[in-house]
Amino acid sequence: MSAERALEAVELARTTGKIKKGANEATKAIERGVAKLVVYAKDVHPAEIVMHLPLLCKEKAVKCVEVPTKEELGIAAGVRVGTAAVAIINEGEAKNILKEL
């Protein structure tokens, strides 16, 4: 899946569904089994903050997508600063985009 489509899904889910912002919130959503899609930023430093997300997603059978920057992800998530990760909890109108993945 492309990073652009993942960011589009985050924006749609933010306005019509529900998302969790931040690496800790995304981790909790995955562990609780409520995450539909996890999107994380490649430029997070230190990388250990998000390094576990792809492995945890694979273990829990959750789709996971990397995007280039935390600033782009923050904008898509509706926050004024960058965010390391976002988990989509309720996809809302982004349901069709998630099906593509």
Report residues per predicted region:
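Polybasic, low-complexity intrinsically disordered tails and interdomain linkers
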Residues: M1-V34, E71, G92-L101
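Signal for well-folded cores of large energy- and translation-related assemblies
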Residues: E11-R14, E31, P54, K58, ...
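Alpha-helical elements of the RecA-like P-loop NTPase motor core of helicases
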Residues: K28, M51, I75
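Compact, glycine-rich, soluble single-domain proteins
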Residues: D43-I49, P54-L55
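Short basic, glycine-rich beta-strand/loop surfaces that mediate nucleic-acid
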Residues: L55-L101
